[in-house]
Amino acid sequence: MGTLSVNQNKLQKRLRRLAGEAITDYNMIEDGDKVMVCLSGGKDSYTMLDVLLHLQKVAPIKFDIVAVNMDQKQPGFPEHVLPAYLKELGVEYHIVEKDTYSVVKELVPEGKTTCSLCSRLRRGTLYTFADEIGATKMALGHHRDDIVETFFLNMFFNGALKGMPPKLRADDGRNVVIRPLAYCSEKDIQAYSDMKEFPIIPCNLCGSQENLQRQVVKDMLVEWERKHPGRTESIFRALQNVAPSQLADRNLFDFTSLKIDESATPRFLDVLNI
């Protein structure tokens, strides 16, 4: 790729700045960390690695980056693509081979979506590998749109007000997951991926599945954004500005103990002079 145009340079700077802000706001990466960057071969993880490699050079702290890809033995998976790309970059990497594809195909009935089981199997394998190599953080390529989509998926289909946090301690307590692209839009990431011409690897297992719940939510958000630009960003900001006393979760706020504060200064409204 040659010299960047003005708009391309702005795009690159914006992604780097937003990732840096997210990392700082949530203390995602600390001095001495060994960050395991999970690469799927998609636009998001390529962009994440690219941005983290830049931040590694300019950050005031020192941290190591190890790229990890999980070969799930999907038919037609181009095994040579990621090793060739990472060797050219000079990045330390590992390819973890585990045939989760066969497990998913065996357990999931024909016509049903494979995403949930596939992601659980992949996540468990990566958690174990992160522990084996001594990684202190595990970086995933989810972006702002993914986080908002997950929020609506949980609300619509699971009856839960939860999303996909920028930083998470895994249930096993031994892994900390970070999402450096949490502030970045999918639109910017797609444009950056196209600009950089990353060697994208399609997912033959789930990429061809239609009518997924997530796709329905994604289409809804795209339509909202088309009619009301900035709505996705506003929803994401709402996730950062939660008021438990204005919701209905009794575990987050003690509604049962609410009483009049006798010491509070009375507020009188002069209704005659409104």
Curated annotation (Swiss-Prot):
Main localization category: cytoplasm
GO cellular-component term (any): cytoplasm
Q: Which domain of life is it from?
A: Bacteria
Its EC top class is transferase
Give yes or no: UniProt keyword DNA-binding: no
Which amino acid positions bind [4Fe-4S] cluster, per UniProt?
A: 115, 118, 206
Among HAMAP family, the record links this protein to: TtcA
Question: What is known about its subunit structure?
Answer: Homodimer.
Name under which the protein is recorded:
tRNA-cytidine(32) 2-sulfurtransferase
The scientific name of the source species is: Pseudomonas entomophila (strain L48)
Whichever gene encodes this chain, its name is ttcA
